[in-house]
Amino acid sequence: MRGGGLWQLGQSVTRRLAQAEKKVIARRCFASEADLKKTALYDFHVANGGKMVPFAGWSMPIQYKDSIMDSTINCRENGSLFDVAHMCGLSLKGKDCIPFLEKLVVGDIAGLAPGTGTLSVLTNEKGGAIDDTVITKVTDDHIYLVVNAGCREKDLAHIEEHMKAFKAKGGDVSWHIHDERSLLALQGPLAAPVLQHLTKEDLSKFYFGQFTFLDINGFPCYLTRTGYTGEDGFEISVPNEYAVDLAKAMLEKSEGKVRLTGRGARDSLRLEAGLCLYGNDLEQHITPIEAGLTWAVGKRRRAEGGFLGAEVILKQIADGPPQRRVGFISSGPPARGHSEIQNEKGESIGEITSGGFSPCLKKNIAMGYVKSGNHKAGTKVNILVRGKPYEGVVTKMPFVPTKYYKSP
């Protein structure tokens, strides 16, 4: 039985997380409430107690009956099922689809083995991040990628603009936006055992970053071993008409241990895993190098360039960026976005981009950007919350160790 003090703390933190998430969601909502889009699982969420809020023009569950703290911990101990169908999946096809995409992203897509994928970044002419995206090389003439819901319109407009110019020069590439499919994320230590009950494919030989077509519970799916929690897990693309039945099947196979989980816990999980949230930790004026994503710039791409903003990005790789994304452990109230970061002399050196109370670590964590030279682990800082300074220390990320199922 939980002690009263911890329970009260948990309830307080849950309310603060929910309030903060709702503020973020409200800022990103691109439609009035009456015009909100609904995923194929909307009625299923409502029937299961989902608290629906607007996000990027969609009505999405922020949480269910469990608190955000309890949902976060349950994902790490058992598992979570998320509806992420608001995100945009699309396919690029044609013999030139890879050369085309490599003009827009920093990754070495040509170097991927068929059936594997990677996180990459769409960049602009100044090297800033238009969006981060998970890209899968299905075959040499078929690329599947997923972009963020809040960036959908600008991403698609950006891709379409460059595709028209590319095709005008004789390039062979076409695209399809998969609005006919839903996307579910099954995450946590029970993700693989639960999914294995529903497919004949041997998931023990299916590793982090890999992609395949397969039947799950008899439904035709795209399966990627990936996620946004730091846990082992899968993202499953399924035709809309089967989404609810597939969700029910996965929950039933877990015997109640895998639970429906909303955006509140998803944000806590990704923060504990040290992962960027576009619009907070990654934006059009921030380069992949500043964001700590240098690893996403393929070796061949560093040598050849050829992508938007390459001159800026390659110079930062060579000389170092002016600012860097780092993690923090802090005292006092949880730091929130735009909280000022000062050095021990009281000089401003950066700002927080994401922060909150870690349900798993039981302490305040945050990430933000500081001027280079202030980024080493162990550096002491002050973080201003409501104008008052609180002690913090630069900390390596992830805050909670990741558990990706990688190839031996």
From Swiss-Prot:
It is found in: Mitochondrion. Its main location: mitochondrion. One of its GO terms (cellular component) is glycine cleavage complex. GO terms for biological process: glycine catabolic process. The keyword Transmembrane does not apply. It catalyses: N(6)-[(R)-S(8)-aminomethyldihydrolipoyl]-L-lysyl-[protein] + (6S)-5,6,7,8-tetrahydrofolate = N(6)-[(R)-dihydrolipoyl]-L-lysyl-[protein] + (6R)-5,10-methylene-5,6,7,8-tetrahydrofolate + NH4(+). Substrate binds at residues 235, 266, 404. Residues 1-30 form a transit peptide. GO terms for molecular function: aminomethyltransferase activity; transaminase activity. Keywords: Aminotransferase, Mitochondrion, Transferase, Transit peptide. Its EC number is 2.1.2.10. The keyword Cell inner membrane does not apply. It holds the Pfam family GCV_T. The glycine cleavage system is composed of four proteins: P, T, L and H. Belongs to the GcvT family. The glycine cleavage system catalyzes the degradation of glycine. This is Aminomethyltransferase, mitochondrial.
